[in-house]
């Protein structure tokens, strides 16, 4: 009995590949092999067989990739122009990367003796160049307006960076100077494609670049904001903004967005506290001063609005939008004065700012100074003065 069990054990230990695995290894094309892997995976004897099956997919797809890459290399050497099947090359690169990660997953599992004895560690180096090819493949698809294909390749490249398959790749080899640029483009495409979770992943990487930080943050905020259909949606977005702002309190985009949300939700206490804290940290914070001026405009407090908007203009004296709001506040202040001489002085001051706004943007492309300027001229000169008539005409052009 014991002898029979020993024979049975030996037979099991040294058994060859299962029929399910043999079927995969007989396949001549990647498509056939992949279909058989998907069909027979559950019938394979163990995790080692599954790893071997996926490694075979790596071999087939890398051959497809390498065959086309060899043509490119020979063209460079011989100065020929033999045709290259870029579609086959790119698909080979993609399939090799996906299969290598699946192979790694099963290759790292304990065997029947409870030991981890990986056989395919070389796949990381083997598919690394194929992985890099997906950057160009995605960009080519993007320029051809094939968003789905671009994201297929870029997502595979981007998401695989953190794969344990590549843990042993040296850091200097992993350094990719184009990473933030591709991440920014990937964020934009993912947002357009309604894959918001992936867009946020891309944004977080793109924001590490000084060149793309501002644009990537705008995309991230747009994604986080969503449609804001309910009160709860708005509160969730506010909390997201708070978290971001807590980690980057000098970021004026976050400050302005959080201020706008507080204003839209009529959270006056929180809004004023936000702006006061920003100014306590930096009294010359232009956004905080401008937003505080707008806060007081909403509260019909012209004096405080004027005070803050003037301070904002001291920091950015060419900001026409602030000039228009300041001019409007001065008009309100002037109209409320009983003293004719006092009104005259304030209207003159309003005209100074509104004339400057007109000078900076004569065609009113960025801000509309027209009505406020006409109102100031009307208040100072009356309805029939030629200057008032001209200001009225300017406002209508």
Regions found by a protein language model. Give the residues of each.
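Canonical tetratricopeptide repeat
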Residues: 56, 170-172, 178, 185-188, ...
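Short coil/linker segments at helix-helix boundaries
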Residues: 62-148, 152, 156, 160-181, ...
């Amino acid at each position: 009995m014991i002898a029979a069990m020993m024979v049975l054990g030996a037979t099991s230990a040294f058994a060859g590949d299962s029929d399910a695995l043999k079927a995969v290894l007989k396949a001549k094309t990647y498509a056939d092999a992949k279909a058989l892997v998907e069909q027979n995976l559950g019938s394979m004897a163990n995790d080692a067989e599954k790893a071997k099956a996926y490694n075979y997919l790596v071999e087939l797809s890398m051959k497809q990739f390498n065959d086309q890459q060899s043509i490119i290399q020979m063209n460079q050497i011989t100065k020929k122009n033999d045709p290259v099947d870029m579609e086959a090359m790119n698909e080979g690169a993609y399939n090799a990367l996906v299969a290598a990660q699946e192979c790694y997953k099963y290759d790292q599992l304990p065997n029947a003796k409870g030991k981890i004895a990986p056989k395919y560690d070389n796949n990381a180096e083997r598919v690394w160049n194929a992985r890099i090819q997906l950057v160009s493949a995605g960009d080519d698809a993007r320029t051809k307006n094939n968003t789905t294909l671009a994201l297929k390749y870029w997502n595979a490249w981007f998401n695989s960076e953190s794969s344990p398959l590549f843990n042993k790749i040296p850091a200097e080899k992993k350094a990719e100077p184009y990473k933030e640029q591709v991440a920014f483009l990937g964020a934009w495409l993912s947002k357009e494609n309604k894959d918001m979770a992936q867009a946020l992943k891309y944004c977080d990487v793109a924001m590490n670049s000084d060149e793309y930080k501002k644009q990537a943050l705008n995309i991230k905020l747009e994604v986080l904001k969503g449609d804001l259909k309910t009160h709860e949606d708005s509160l969730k977005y506010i909390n997201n903004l708070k978290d971001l702002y807590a980690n980057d309190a000098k970021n004026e985009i976050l400050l302005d967005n959080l201020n706008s949300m507080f204003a839209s939700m009529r959270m006056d206490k929180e809004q004023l506290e936000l702006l006061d804290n920003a100014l306590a940290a930096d009294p010359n914070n232009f956004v905080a001063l401008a937003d505080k001026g707008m806060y007081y405009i909403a509260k019909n407090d012209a004096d405080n609005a004027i005070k803050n908007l003037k301070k904002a203009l001291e920091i950015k004296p060419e900001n026409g939008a602030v000039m228009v709001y300041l001019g409007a506040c001065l008009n309100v202040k002037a109209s409320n004065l009983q003293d004719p001489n006092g009104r005259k002085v304030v209207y003159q001051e309003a005209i100074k700012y509104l004339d400057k706004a007109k000078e900076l943007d004569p065609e009113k492309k960025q801000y509309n100074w027209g009505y406020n300027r006409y109102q100031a001229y009307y208040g100072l000169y009356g309805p029939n003065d030629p200057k008032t008539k001209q200001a009225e005409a300017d406002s209508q052009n």
